[in-house]
Amino acid sequence: MKSELIHTNQSESFLWINKVIIRHLIFSDLPQLEWNGEYQHLRQVYLNAYKNRNQGKNVLWVADLPQVGVIGQVFIQLNSVRKDLADGFFSAYLYAFRIKPEFRNTGLGSRMIGVVEKDLVKRNFREITLNVAKTNNRAIHLYERLGFEIVGSEPGEWSYRDHNNKLQNVSEPAWKMVKSISK
């Protein structure tokens, strides 16, 4: 189905995008976030994000293409221990933003960020922060095009428990980016 939707003639090549539903993640979506095993190691991270969503700490979004499934995701942390990222009132933190490779460069990522921004404005937030790997030039370009600005450097050090409950340490130097949003 995916290749049929994408690889048709030029005028029909992106008709699938009109069928994409951007909605809140539900529990049954969690296995699809593993992308056929590529992100299996993040299973506990996703489950914890879902639990935090149930406590009102996170807002989790997916892009769902009927008859294909979840093809994108973006998570928002409303309140963090690090108040410079998400303070619960003014600033929210965007993370775990992914679009499956075959659906990139189609406008879907921009559309998802637009949905997130509108939702955060309704919640009276005024700023979105994110960290992006310094080596991820395509993502940096997307964020800059969407109005985010680099405001600092982050060490990008964090840890998580993988699907085997083994502690994994990550070191991925990142740029901290910020965008002001308003009504």
What are these regions (language model features)?
Residues 120-131:
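Conserved GNAT acetyl-CoA-binding A-motif
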Residues 86-91, 124, 167-173:
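A generic structural micro-feature
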Residues 107, 124, 147:
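Short glycine-rich hinge loops at helix-strand junctions in the catalytic core
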